[in-house]
């Protein structure tokens, strides 16, 4: 018979096992490789209305997650603030497994960006590794949702799969996730579209912004489903498909243009994650030793004085 007066045994805190205790974590030591962001377009195309570059803003945002890392950025086109300049004079100390990690600031496979990175690496001879782009990733859908809400096209809070009829003529009743980069980019945008549809409770479809046949097919599909206020949400930071070009495309297909992703703290977090993924894959992070692990709380485990 169980004694009801007896206290239950105290459960000691469990140690987290495995190498990846935190997806952003790796062992920090003096000489951590630099993080170089490859910004699509030219320096002029990547400038915002306030004159500040998307690369500079993203560098500040990524620095919040990786303050111990040297962060640079360079543009894949033009002759100012180029990627080749950012890859020049990287520290090749013996305590580094490589000089740097290049993170493309694109949300999907982008042939032009990949080719420019290869050219810059060949030109400089930099010992760097290249990560995947920023997408597909679940946080991209959140950023797209935020941009649509800021423009008044959708509700700011999640609808949680409940379809709600738009109350006015400004809210969207269909969304097109615009991809830039060809078939691979459309596939990545399709993943984001599914996640965004789950957030909004609306029909969300991917389309290739650079292919009018793809746009026509998707817009026709939305119209057949009853959509009269479709919105194009570009899954791009901005320089890949300028705003004026998007506005012309939207007018041609009777849709409204949404804002590009731009620099965002969530995108900065994804960039930091991509950086950590490369270092972890190279074995930079080592499993903690028994001495490095914190001792469990409890009188039996107090360190000897």
Where are these regions (language model features)?
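Active-site-proximal alpha-helix that buttresses catalytic centers in soluble enzyme cores
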Residues: 1-305
């Amino acid at each position: 018979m169980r004694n009801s007066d007896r206290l239950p045994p105290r459960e000691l805190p469990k140690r987290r096992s495995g190498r990846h205790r935190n997806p952003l974590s790796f062992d920090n030591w003096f000489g951590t490789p630099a993080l170089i962001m490859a910004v699509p377009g030219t320096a002029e195309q990547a400038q915002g209305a306030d004159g500040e570059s998307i690369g500079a803003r993203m560098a500040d945002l990524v620095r919040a997650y990786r303050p111990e890392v040297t962060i640079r950025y360079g543009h894949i086109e033009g002759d100012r603030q180029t990627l080749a300049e950012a890859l020049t004079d990287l520290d090749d100390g013996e305590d580094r497994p490589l000089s740097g990690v290049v993170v493309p600031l694109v949300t999907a496979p982008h042939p032009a960006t990949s080719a420019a990175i290869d050219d810059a690496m060949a030109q400089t001879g930099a010992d760097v590794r290249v990560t995947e782009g920023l997408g597909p990733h679940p946080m991209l859908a959140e950023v797209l949702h935020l941009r649509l809400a800021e423009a008044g096209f959708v509700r700011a809070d999640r609808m949680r799969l409940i379809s709600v009829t738009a109350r006015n003529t400004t809210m969207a009743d269909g969304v097109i996730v615009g991809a830039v980069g060809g078939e691979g980019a459309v596939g990545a945008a399709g993943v984001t579209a599914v996640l965004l549809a789950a957030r909004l409770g609306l029909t969300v479809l991917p389309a290739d912004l650079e292919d009018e046949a793809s746009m026509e097919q998707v817009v026709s599909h939305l119209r057949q489903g009853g959509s009269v206020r479709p919105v194009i949400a570009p899954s791009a930071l901005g320089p890949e498909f300028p705003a004026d070009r998007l506005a012309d495309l939207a007018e041609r297909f009777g849709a409204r243009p949404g804002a590009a992703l731009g620099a965002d703290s969530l995108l900065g977090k994804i960039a930091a994650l991509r950086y950590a993924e490369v270092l972890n894959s190279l074995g930079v992070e080592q499993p903690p030793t028994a001495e490095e692990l914190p001792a469990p709380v409890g009188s039996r485990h107090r360190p000897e004085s």
